[in-house]
Amino acid sequence: MAHSASPSLYRSPQEAMEAPPEEFLYLACLHEGTGVDAPDFLAVVDTNGGRVVHELPMPNAGDELHHFGWNRCSSACHGPDRSHLIVPGFRSSRVHVVNVADDPRKPYIEKVIEPEEVVAKTGYTRPHTVHCMPGDNIVVSMLGDADGNASGGFAVIDAKTFEVKGRWENGGERPPMNYDFWYQPRKNVLVSSEFGEPNAYEKGFDLADVEAGRYGQRIHFWDLERRTLEQTVDLGAKGLLPFELRWLHDPDSEEGFVGAALSSVLWHFHRANGAWAADPVIEVESVPLEGWPFPVPGVMSDLVLSMDDRFVYLANWLHGDVRQYDVTNPAEPKLTGQVWLGGVIGKPTDGPRELNGGPNMVQLSFDGRRLYVSNSLYSSWDNQFYPEMRSWLTRINCDPNGGMELDPGFFVDFHDRPDGPARAHEMRLQGGDCTTEIFQ
């Protein structure tokens, strides 16, 4: 059981796996790029009925809601329970503090941190990943400076007052770029990845920008207590655009995974002889396609690790498949399941309906049985690669012993809406999920 004072915070992965099934989830939905002149919104989706039961619009248009997270998670399990979602605008650099404690199914905006304040106190823009940390801190990875150039730092927000406190890193060397991050308290380490320069990716993808070094290929290891950069691992040509990082949930582990989106390679990082190393363990082959100037890469856009660290699920946004691998031995993953959900290479879609777009974000329930999938990556990239995109949220049923199949009864359509189409991006499950919880 969870702590009595913190009913949705857990002392161990096993405790989280025993939590009741989620009844609803929160979903970041955007109008940016759709032609609809309206603010983005946070949707509340009933996971039993597969329908939107509440929408919380942001106060301004043009935010590009993307990733978001809790003010508290299990790494701070000895304090108050989670009560707020921190919802940044990836394009606007505006940060919304959303109260989910008073009525979890009808959240409301409690505070808005304007981009001018973020820049004044940190010098950073383009907030991405949100993680709570012990000590009443919320840490947010920041991808740009005030002019849209690449930057490799982090912002800190007070988890009680929601005031911006400044930069997280403690001086010294900083990476040239940033994107996702994860940390292991017992091992005193934080790892961060790289996307690219906002001035490059915001306008759409151009291969020339990769060749010009405007996109990343490195992961970085930090001393968590000292908040200083300790080591950088360059992944090279097989590590282009290292997006999402997933440390094993075991708090004593010294290994995890990162997905290189453009190279479509899953890397296994680990500590070896006192230093950090990374090895490619899954390589998704590019597919020749008529009309394309180069073979189509999978674009490994997201991955999630089951709470028991047995399975990793990854999405290939352009190819259109979601894969399940047994990673009992993290250095030698074994494919155990695959579902097709759209894509550009012409594979038939599993299930009762044709899908436009490809699987982008994935989120897994604590018990490892329900995998939620959405299809918007980033507005300008959506329009470039899927100009006729119709956005959706669907669910895959996962066998905890291996294997998975599409749930034909769960489908949320975000295209045919009274106010015009929207696009679905990241999900947060009621009471936490497999990419929010870090254990001490």
Predicted segments with their positions:
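Structural signature of eukaryotic scaffold interfaces centered on beta-propeller domains
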Residues: H3-P21, L65-D81, G123-P134, W182-N188, ...
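Short, conserved, GDST-rich strand-edge loop motifs in beta-rich repeat architectures
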Residues: A19-P20, L27-D37, G79-S83, V87-P88, ...
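Beta-propeller blade signature
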Residues: D40-D46, S151-F162, D209-R226, P387-P400
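Short loop/turn segments immediately following beta-strands, especially the blade-tip
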Residues: V44-G49, V97-Y108, A159-F162, D223-R227, ...
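Blade-loop segments of beta-propeller domains
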Residues: R51-T129
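Surface-exposed loop and turn segments in beta-propeller and other repeat-based domains
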Residues: V53-H67, E110-G123, R167-P176, L229-G239, ...
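Asp-box/WD-like beta-propeller blade repeats and closely related beta-sheet repeat scaffolds
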Residues: V100-P185
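Beta-propeller domains
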Residues: G171-N178, W182-P330
